[in-house]
Amino acid sequence: MKILTIILSLFIITVANADIKGSVLSKASDKISEYTIGLIPGEGYTEASIDLREGFKPDYSILAVRELLKIDSGNIFTQFSLFNTEQANEEKIIGNFGLGTRKLFDDNTVLAGFNAFVDNDFSETNRRASIGFELRNAVLDFHSNIYEGLQDSDDERVLNGWDYRLASQVPYLHWSKIFINHYEWDGVLRDDIKGTKMGSEMILTRSLNFEIAYDDKDKKGLEDEWYAKILFVHPPRDNGSTAKDGISQVAFKDNKDMSGELLSKVKRNNKIMIEFKGSATVSRAD
């Protein structure tokens, strides 16, 4: 799987740096993103993704952000998603539903927001809630979330925890960001779980994003791993840099209007972290 991830990332980066306009990759990503909007009605951000991870089957998800109400220099929105994931060799279906508000400051160049979510495991009775905060501009993103278990199943215990994510635009590559994502989960029957993800997000085409990262876990029984994520988004971007723009002459973007980010997705861990009762195992950290 590690070899597959590396090959996949190199392949996509190589293709994306070519002249993608009119290429098979660009046309295919536009078609897939166009199809996703038909699955969820309404205007806003829609995303379909494939998550490739060492030692696990691929996870597939669909996510949408929709505006509920416009407010002065901001909005109130909802975000919901549905996806499959594998835990202890068992396939699970997880759903998330959240409400959030965002507001623009400093001539619309700074975005701040708060959100609250409920996560539900449709395969078990596991439920979790979270609250989150975000602060963003054209170059830097900061997200932080606190998670609290609401209900356990017979043989699984939902863990409480928190995380933060700090991302920065890569100098001269306006279509790429690097990020660090630290998380901690409070063990009940076993030790706490801590870890840090380090990786990169890339906007390859108007409709195709790619993320690759290394998940460094500080917990016996949970192996460190690479993961790669392919994301098809809709609607296609009307402006902004993509990989075909290559290297810019300017290190960082100018202060841009963040109004276009009011309906971007909330960055959080949508998967429910659990501990298995009566055994010495825990689920993967994401």
Each model region followed by its residue ranges:
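Transmembrane beta-barrel domains of Gram-negative outer membranes and organellar outer membranes
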Residues: S29-S33, P41-E90, G95
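Feature captures outer-membrane beta-barrel proteins of Gram-negative bacteria and organelles
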Residues: E34-T36, P58-I71, I93-D107, A129-I146, ...
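Intrinsically disordered low-complexity regions specifically enriched for long asparagine
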Residues: T14-I20, S61-A64
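Solvent-exposed loop/turn segments connecting transmembrane beta-strands
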Residues: I50-Y60, F83-G95, N120-R128, D152-L159, ...
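Bacterial N-terminal signal peptides that target proteins for export
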Residues: M1-L4, V65, N115
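Flexible, glycine-rich linker and terminal segments associated
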Residues: D19-L39, L150-F179, Y183-R190, M202-D286
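Classical Sec-dependent N-terminal signal peptides that target proteins to the secretory pathway
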Residues: M1-A18
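Transmembrane beta-strand segments that form the barrel wall of outer-membrane beta-barrel proteins
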Residues: E43-L52, G74-E86, V110-D121, I131, ...
